[in-house]
A protein has these predicted regions:
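Extended, histidine- and acidic-residue-enriched regions that form the cofactor-binding/catalytic faces
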Residues: 27-273
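Short amphipathic, helix-prone segments within low-complexity/disordered or flexible regions
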Residues: 2-6, 16-20, 24-27
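Polybasic, lysine-rich low-complexity intrinsically disordered segments
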Residues: 9-13
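Generic low-complexity, intrinsically disordered sequence content enriched
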Residues: 7-8, 254
Length: 273
């Protein structure tokens, strides 16, 4: 995963004063620690993968605004954290040979256009990317599962997985979901980031956004995107977020994805149910 770094502001509050450092920058050990998993595609060799027919788990995220307090790659970080933990859990159960792929870090984020930093490749391009990724990887991987961290990617994932399955490839996908989660850059995502990347949360910039139900906001968002309903780019309330809550939410996401992958019952669009 390619991470985006920005100059630190002097006024920024530190969440983890005793975190280890890389150079002069504090690093969160929880995010950078490599959880035990069978292997990672980026550090494997072709010879190691020969004749093993591994199952491949691929995080899918985005580069988009997450309010004034969260990094642009928030969705990718969450998808990667969930995918890594799921791969480790499945490996512990000896459920196939799982390999964690580098994240697909760009997604369909058109609703966030107009906010600086957002880079959206759109649904059509993402669909094509996922299809070609799947066609290539399926030549040596026995199964493909995309772990999605951004709601705007679901249309592309559904179309791509449906085509891959029609072509005879064993592909599926699931999203990082939690019960009663708010929509964007609010309590849910901020809590998870406080757990996995505390030094990259600008806690002094946290402000409550629009907390209306997403169903009520959608008519305006279809016309003008997130900016039409929240000047901050926040849908929810990040001021209530805690690292402890983030740990619980992440575990819930991992549990849900693990169950769906273990059960492996894809619907007509390849979504695991």
């Amino acid at each position: 995963m390619v991470r985006l770094w920005f100059p630190m502001k002097k006024s920024r509050k530190s969440i983890a004063a005793h975190a280890p450092t890389i150079g002069a920058r504090q690093v969160n050990s929880a995010y950078h620690r490599r959880v035990a998993s069978p292997s990672e595609l980026s550090t494997s060799t072709s010879r190691q993968l020969q004749r093993t027919s591994p199952a491949l788990i691929i995080p899918v995220g985005s580069v988009e605004q997450h309010g004034p307090h969260l990094p642009l790659d928030t969705d990718t970080r969450i998808a990667t954290a969930v995918a890594r933990s799921v791969a480790a859990r499945l490996a512990d159960r000896n459920e196939s040979n799982w390999v964690l792929a580098p994240a697909i870090g760009y997604g369909a984020s058109g609703e966030h256009e107009g906010f600086a930093g957002t880079v959206s490749i759109g649904t059509s391009a993402l669909r094509l990317l996922l299809v070609e990724f799947g066609r290539s990887a399926a030549q040596w991987a026995s199964r493909l599962v995309f772990v999605n961290g951004h709601g705007g990617n679901t249309e592309a994932l559904a179309a791509a997985a449906a085509l891959l399955r029609y072509e005879g490839r064993d592909a599926g996908w699931c999203s990082c979901t939690a019960e009663n989660a708010d929509a964007h850059a609010g309590h849910t995502e901020t809590s998870v980031l406080l757990h996995i990347s505390p030094t990259d949360v600008w806690v002094d910039e946290c402000l409550a956004g629009n907390s209306a139900p997403l169903s009520k906001l959608m008519p305006q968002m279809r016309q003008g995107g997130v900016a039409a309903v929240s000047e901050l780019g926040v849908l929810g309330d990040p001021t209530t977020a805690t690292a402890q809550e983030g740990e619980r939410i992440l575990a819930e996401m991992v549990d849900a994805c693990s169950r769906r992958i273990t059960r492996w019952v894809p619907d007509r669009d390849g979504m695991l149910t």
